[in-house]
């Protein structure tokens, strides 16, 4: 059974150049994304306490994402970069989450799991790009470790969806959402941020 997600488009060189030109801002945004990823995993636990089969993995994922936040924060501290007092709205996430609205509570649950998978896989793809192109050796090593972890998270959410929904339903909807994500990511304004 296939758990991995293949994105429909690659991140652009223009996005990578924008990040490399203002890496401090990228780190600030990255820290915020890790904090939100931890909160998202726990929000599944809060909203779906009856889905007992996946709660242990969700808690483990939330803890791991919080550890990533701590690692990014520690790295920022060493480099003299403060957490921002206010973060910009994440247009990417807003547009993706809009795709999960409507339908039944079950289909919303399914779509939220699949969307979490796609977001983790986009993070993985972008962390890999950063690790391969940044000249700072410490940052290169850090992002190499992170992209491997994010790939695992992407797989976890597909696996969770398959516990509750038929294979065809999961993969058909996943394909639809992957195509929509490609349209969204291709139209995003360039900024030194993960999304």
Task: For each feature predicted by the language model, list its residue ranges.
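Non-heme di-metal
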Residues: 1-195
């Amino acid at each position: 059974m296939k758990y991995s997600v293949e994105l429909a488009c690659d991140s652009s060189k223009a996005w990578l150049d924008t990040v490399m030109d203002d890496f401090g801002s990228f780190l600030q945004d990255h820290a915020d994304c890790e904090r939100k990823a931890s909160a998202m995993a726990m929000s599944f636990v809060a909203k779906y306490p009856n889905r007992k089969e996946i709660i242990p993995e969700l808690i483990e994922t939330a803890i791991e994402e919080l550890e990533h936040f701590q690692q990014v924060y520690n790295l920022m501290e060493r480099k003299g970069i403060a957490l921002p007092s206010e973060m910009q709205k994440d247009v990417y996430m807003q547009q993706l989450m809009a795709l999960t609205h409507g339908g039944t509570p079950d289909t919303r649950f399914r779509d939220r799991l699949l969307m979490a998978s796609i977001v983790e896989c986009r993070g993985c793809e972008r962390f890999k790009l950063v690790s391969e192109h940044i000249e700072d050796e410490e940052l290169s090593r850090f992002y190499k470790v992170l992209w491997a972890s994010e790939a695992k998270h992407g797989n976890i959410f597909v696996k969770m969806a398959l516990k509750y929904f038929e294979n065809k339903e999961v993969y058909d909807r996943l394909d639809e959402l992957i195509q929509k994500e490609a349209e969204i990511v291709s139209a995003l304004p360039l900024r030194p941020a993960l999304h």
